[in-house]
From Swiss-Prot:
This is Somatotropin. Belongs to the somatotropin/prolactin family. It comes from Pan troglodytes (Chimpanzee). Residues 1-26 form the signal peptide. The gene is GH1. GO terms for biological process: animal organ development; growth hormone receptor signaling pathway; positive regulation of receptor signaling pathway via JAK-STAT; response to nutrient levels. The keyword Metal-binding applies. It holds the Pfam family Hormone_1.
């Protein structure tokens, strides 16, 4: 292979491995469309993992009558993310600016950086492909960085950084033989699935507004 071709391949490989390269680096500016594609891939993967793990756990451990009583009880089905002001319907969502939706998505992602560790035993026993606490954590961190990069690009061209959002989920007993622990883990999975759905939805809306030809995908 010619030296020039080898250099081009190495550069391309480096860009693929580092999707959130800072704008002021020696590398070419990454197209906005690609930044959104990278963010959407991670958001979709997180949402799918959350949905599949929740469904698997529910079918294995939660009787149908227990599920209905759990979901109908505001005390047990309350997610910590309820404290993060988020639009509750399509109309409210459409009224939010791109930066507002990205900011909300960032807070939702950051609110799960610690709680996913409480689900270590759930992920370890899951048959869902890629469901491990380390893999989920890495996806969350990657998406956190990606959203910060998008916020900077849409605002002033420089990556945004900030304090990690502090959550208040209490540590749960992960003893799988404890009924109370099962319900608490079920509650965490329920909230995780719900929040990842919001993140994917908000990012898709911002992508549609920002990148021509990206709506409907």
């Amino acid at each position: 292979m010619a030296p020039g071709s080898r250099t081009s391949l190495l550069l391309a490989f480096g860009l693929l491995c580092l999707p959130w390269l800072q704008e002021g680096s020696a590398f070419p500016t990454i197209p906005l469309s690609r930044l959104f594609d990278n963010a959407m891939l991670r958001a979709h993967r997180l949402h799918q993992l959350a949905f599949d793990t929740y469904q698997e756990f529910e079918e294995a451990y939660i009787p149908k009558e227990q599920k209905y009583s759990f979901l109908q009880n505001p005390q047990t089905s309350l997610c910590f993310s309820e404290s993060i002001p988020t639009p509750s319907n399509r109309e409210e969502t459409q009224q939010k600016s791109n930066l507002e939706l990205l900011r909300i998505s960032l807070l939702l992602i950051q609110s799960w950086l610690e709680p996913v560790q409480f689900l270590r035993s759930v992920f370890a026993n899951s048959l869902v492909y890629g469901a491990s606490d380390s893999n989920v954590y890495d996806l969350l961190k990657d998406l956190e960085e990606g959203i910060q990069t998008l916020m900077g690009r849409l605002e002033d061209g420089s990556p945004r950084t900030g304090q990690i959002f502090k959550q208040t989920y209490s540590k749960f007993d992960t003893n799988s033989h404890n009924d109370d622990a099962l319900l608490k883990n079920y509650g965490l999975l329920y909230c995780f699935r719900k929040d990842m759905d919001k993140v994917e939805t908000f990012l898709r809306i911002v992508q549609c507004r920002s990148v021509e030809g990206s709506c409907g995908f």
